[in-house]
Amino acid sequence: MPLSQEESTLIERATATINSIPISEDYSVASAALSSDGRIFTGVNVYHFTGGPCAELVVLGTAAAAAAGNLTCIVAIGNENRGILSPCGRCRQVLLDLHPGIKAVVKDSDGQPTAVGIRELLPSGYMNRA
């Protein structure tokens, strides 16, 4: 299914974000998310040998700090023209827990961008809440 204009805009914003910073091992992925009120939030990962947040988690914090409410779609873009990256397992779980209705833009089996529900990416996620 083709992406909506909003979903395509997320790709553009995340791509612009990662391309605006110098190439670095410490900041190698950007993410953009759309809130239900139409705002777009961006962020980049922070790599550190002790662990660090993925770009998606940085965006979740940025959106929460801005009282964004529900996020409806998210995408991650790798630096050095790596393009769309699928959320890692930890990000999938956090997205499911905090925004169970969110879609993530990923590549389909033909390498084309598509937006899928987080439950499709993590159908049997751990349920920490009753």
From Swiss-Prot:
Full protein name: Blasticidin-S deaminase
UniProt subunit comment: Homotetramer.
Transmembrane segments: none
Gene behind this protein: bsd
Signal peptide span: none
Co-factor requirement: Zn(2+)
Protein EC: 3.5.4.23
The family this protein is said to belong to: Belongs to the cytidine and deoxycytidylate deaminase family.
Binding site for substrate: 28, 82, 126
Gene Ontology CC entries for this record: cytosol
Catalytic reaction list: blasticidin S + H2O + H(+) = deaminohydroxyblasticidin S + NH4(+)
